[in-house]
Amino acid sequence: MSDWLFDLGNSRFKFAPLQGDRAGDVQAWAHGAEGMAGQPPHSLPSGTTAFVASVAAPSLTSAMLDQLQRRFEHVHVVRTSAECAGVRIAYAKPEKFGVDRFLALLAAAKAQRPVLVVGVGTALTIDLLDANGQHHGGRISASPTTMREALHARAVQLPATGGDYSEFANDTADALASGCDGAAVALIERSAQQAHALLGVAPSLLVHGGGAPALMPLLPGADYHPSLVLDGLARWAVHQPAG
């Protein structure tokens, strides 16, 4: 029997075996939580313990937990705490801090260096962690994908997808891609500058999330870590009391 990690996001459901204090090979359902009910039972693993993180709607989270409870002896759902694995969250009310951001910080803290953690999903999240595991707070904005969708919803003639980044675009699709990606990059760069001023040292830049690959060419020196949240969930799992 084995232990598994499950990450239910707003757009994707990912899972991987727990291997030491990290995630093993990751599997993903790109269609997200809504498609879980249509998956055949053998699509999900079974084992001893399931460690679960979810930022999805309560109804979808409940549906996932129902399936996992049929396949695992124990199911543990992560909640953000003020301190875990040497990481101390800056929020006065840690329960208000998103569990995906919390787990990303747990994974990032393993390197024991200042780091700016950037998540690019439905939202763009930016969090600063120092070398001692102290979280210094962060920012939340719309991701480029969400910006495009919002513009299209208000002005249907503006395409929700397509286009390539250009510093000065000469067509609408490219201008939209450039503006939305550029806005995200500008916020990340501003955060990195302010982090340097605060800590006295430039933090490394760690990027994760489904929208991250589109931004990586615009962020020289950044590291892309697609399994960051699952790796953080693994660290959370191994720091739980036995039993």
From Swiss-Prot:
**Residues at which substrate binds:** 91, 98-101, 172
Protein's UniProt name: Type III pantothenate kinase
The record's InterPro entries line, in alphabetical order, gives: ATPase_NBD, Type_III_PanK
Keywords from UniProt, A to Z, are:
ATP-binding, Coenzyme A biosynthesis, Cytoplasm, Kinase, Nucleotide-binding, Potassium, Transferase
**Taxonomically, what lineage is the organism?**
Bacteria, Pseudomonadati, Pseudomonadota, Gammaproteobacteria, Lysobacterales
Superkingdom classification of source: Bacteria
Copy the pathway line from the protein's UniProt record: Cofactor biosynthesis; coenzyme A biosynthesis; CoA from (R)-pantothenate: step 1/5
SUPFAM superfamilies noted in UniProt: Actin-like ATPase domain (SSF53067)
Signal sequence residues? none
Q: Could you give the cofactor binding note from the entry?
A: A monovalent cation. Ammonium or potassium.
Into which family does the record put it?
Belongs to the type III pantothenate kinase family.
User: Could you tell me one molecular function GO term of this UniProt entry?
Assistant: pantothenate kinase activity
Q: Name one GO biological process term.
A: coenzyme A biosynthetic process
Which gene is transcribed and translated to give this protein? coaX
Q: Cite the binding residues for ATP.
A: 7-14, 122
Q: How does it assemble?
A: Homodimer.
Cofactors: NH4(+); K(+)
